[in-house]
UniProtKB/Swiss-Prot annotation:
Residues 125-141 have a biased composition (Basic and acidic residues). It is an enzyme of class 5 (isomerase). One of its GO terms (cellular component) is mitochondrion. It comes from Rhizopus delemar (strain RA 99-880 / ATCC MYA-4621 / FGSC 9543 / NRRL 43880). SMART domains: RRM (SM00360). This is Peptidyl-prolyl cis-trans isomerase E. GO terms for biological process: protein folding.
């Protein structure tokens, strides 16, 4: 999509940092459009490098409405895009007129205060947190032994969904153990509960219409918890399967090789997630239930009703 000048209204403009070089304005637009009408998207190009394909790792998204901007910030801050955790905050304004054609990142004083320096500090803090998290995870070892009979084969599981106080119905999913055996086995065993823990009675904590329904955090219920049958987080198995359309089942993560138990069911085609999230299944029955779940979602991701997996297992 073409660049459009960002205004100085910091109530509707987001500053997004930590962007991978694969991210362009079209990708940024696609990632943030679920939250509301976007007026403009700009990437900060590196003026020291003679190439239109190189950016400085951050960009701006301007929304028409302040509430949409706030919803995007609340939902996308510390989320993952192209394998990197991004940071989203309200853009800091500089003293220029709204009719100025000068991009905000061309002001070096702005960059020193709000741009790259901040990113370095945040990166150092992130590395510190990640090191602490990795050390903690190494202590968590599972005694569960995954079924060797199920690995390498397709299987089917079900999720019985309750929305509010009403039983909405059953979702049946085919797991692609023939393509991603480790990932599929993790989900299957969490559905049956044979490892001593699993998805039963857990909720879908994040639902965004025209995007996806995310669940699987059975330890904290807010998107910060969950664990795999392997004792902690496990690696990205492969990216053979793609996010081709509604009903795609994929692993939620916080960056490369951080798979646990959280997953999401796509309600639309989400190709920008290809190569970054491991697809391991497909809804084969009950897509109407997924659509009913989707209607409980919001731009911020917070469901209007509690959506719970009241029962689950293998077919």
């Amino acid at each position: 999509m073409p660049s459009v000048n960002i205004t100085k209204n910091n109530k509707t403009t987001l500053y997004i940092s930590g962007l991978d070089q694969q991210v362009n304005e079209a990708v940024l637009h696609a990632a943030f459009i679920p939250f509301g009408e976007i007026i403009a998207v700009q990437m900060a190009t590196d003026t020291e490098i003679d190439s239109n394909n190189i950016h400085r790792g951050f960009g701006f998204v301007e929304y028409e409405l302040a509430e949409d901007c706030q919803a995007a910030m609340d939902n996308m801050h510390l989320s993952e895009l192209y394998g990197k955790v991004i940071k989203v905050q309200l853009a800091k304004t500089i003293n220029v007129t709204t009719t100025s054609n000068r991009a905000v990142w061309t002001d070096e004083s702005w960059l020193q205060k709000y741009g790259n320096v901040e990113d370095v500090e945040e990166k150092q803090e992130d590395e510190k947190e990640n090191n602490q998290e990795t050390t903690s995870e190494k202590k968590e070892v599972s005694s569960y032994i995954p079924s060797s009979e199920k690995r390498g084969k397709k299987s089917r599981v079900y999720l019985d969904i309750q929305i509010g106080n009403t039983l909405a119905g059953r979702i049946e999913i085919e797991l692609r153990g023939d393509v991603v055996p480790k990932t599929a086995e993790n989900f299957r065993a969490l559905c049956t509960g044979e490892a001593g823990f699993g998805y039963k009675k857990s909720s879908f904590h994040r639902i965004i219409p025209q995007f996806m329904c995310q669940g699987g955090d059975f330890t904290k219920g807010n998107g910060t918890g969950g664990k795999s049958i392997y004792g902690g987080k496990f690696e990205d198995e492969n990216f053979v399967l793609k996010h081709t359309g509604p009903g795609t089942l994929s692993m939620a993560n916080a960056g490369s090789n951080t798979n646990g138990s959280q997953f999401f069911i796509c309600t639309e085609k989400t190709t920008w997630l290809d190569g970054k999230h491991v697809v391991f299944g497909q809804v084969v029955s009950g897509m109407n239930v997924v659509r009913e779940m989707e209607r409980c979602g919001s731009a911020s991701g917070k469901p209007s009703k509690r959506v719970v997996i009241v029962d689950c297992g293998e077919l």
